[in-house]
Amino acid sequence: MIRVLVVDDHDLVRTGITRMLADIDGLQVVGQAESGEESLLKARELKPYVVLMDVKMPGIGGLEATRKLLRSHPDIKVVAVTVCEEDPFPTRLLQAGAAGYLTKGAGLNEMVQAIRLVFAGQRYISPQIAQQLVFKSFQPSSDSPFDALSEREIQIALMIVGCQKVQIISDKLCLSPKTVNTYRYRIFEKLSISSDVELTLLAVRHGMVDASL
């Protein structure tokens, strides 16, 4: 039996995935988590074999959660699930150790296939994302300015885009407000911007966030 943990900040998504997988032979959803932080606690408590990890969540987010999770539980297989097909997320999640990558447009059969393959020690990348990664490999240079940012800088940039205040970011990441502001100015400098509004527009333009949200 493959033990699965579902991680997503939207209750409707978590419930939907859990219900879809409930009738699949050989799979058991052992729990749900609504944030990256909670996924770390649930993984320790429930000992899943596979984690379906939403990429864009408040707090530490799926990228940082994957990195932390695999550092403490290297045998767990993480399948990233996101609405975003554009870099830098697919590349960064795979570099962080994710064994699979799905879009939220994936059907039940594809999701089950991904879970079973990564559990068996293989990788699974959805066709759309695989195609995008192949095309990118032939490009002489990156088209996304966000590739210049570190994982921590991307994490903080997305929290800023999500309208989270400096003190909230500070509390969630266990950093001082001064350090958060230092990251913020460094992000602005690397992206050649000067405001949170410009950061948000740039993030939308390069597929870092869903423009409809």
From Swiss-Prot:
The record places domain Response regulatory at 3-119
Query: Phenotype upon knockout?
Result: No longer produces the secondary metabolites diacetylphloroglucinol (Phl) or pyoluteorin (2 antifungals) or HCN. No longer protects tobacco plants from attack by the black root rot-causing fungus Thielaviopsis basicola. 50-fold decrease in expression of hcnA. Greatly decreased expression of genes controlled by this two-component system such as aprA, hcnA, phlA and pltA. Loss of expression of small RNAs (sRNA) RsmX, RsmY and RsmZ. Loss of the autoinducing signal (which is unrelated to N-acylhomoserine lactones and induces the Gac/Csr cascade).
For this chain, one GO molecular function annotation is: DNA binding
- A biological process term (GO) from this entry: phosphorelay signal transduction system
What changing residue 90 to L does, per the record, is: In the spontaneous pleiotropic mutant BL915-1
Identify the keywords attached in UniProt to this record, alphabetized.
Activator, DNA-binding, Phosphoprotein, Transcription, Transcription regulation, Two-component regulatory system
* Induction field: Increases 2-fold from exponential to stationary phase (at protein level).
Q: Which Pfam families match?
A: GerE, Response_reg
**Does this UniProt record's set of keywords contain Transcription?**
yes
Q: Which residues form the HTH luxR-type domain?
A: 142-207
Note the PROSITE patterns from the entry: HTH_LUXR_1, HTH_LUXR_2, RESPONSE_REGULATORY
The superkingdom of the source organism is: Bacteria
Q: Which positions does the record tag as DNA-binding?
A: 166-185
| Keyword set includes Transcription regulation | yes
> What kind of modification does the protein receive after translation?
Phosphorylated by GacS.
Effect of substituting residue 182 to I:
In the spontaneous pleiotropic mutant BL915-2
Positions carrying 4-aspartylphosphate are: 54
**What NCBIfam families does the record tag this protein with?**
PRK09483.1 (NF007018)
Q: Per its database record, what is this protein's job?
A: Member of the two-component regulatory system GacA/GacS which controls the expression of secondary metabolites and extracellular products. Acts (probably primarily) by activating expression of CsrA1 and CsrA2 antagonist small RNAs (sRNA) RsmX, RsmY and RsmZ which bind to and prevent translation repression by CsrA1 and CsrA2. Involved in the regulation of secondary metabolism and in the synthesis of the antifungal factors cyanide, 2,4-diacetylphloroglucinol and pyoluteorin. Involved in synthesis of the autoinducing signal (unrelated to N-acylhomoserine lactones, induces the Gac/Csr cascade).
Query: What name is this protein filed under?
Result: Response regulator GacA
**Protein species of origin:** Pseudomonas protegens (strain DSM 19095 / LMG 27888 / CFBP 6595 / CHA0)
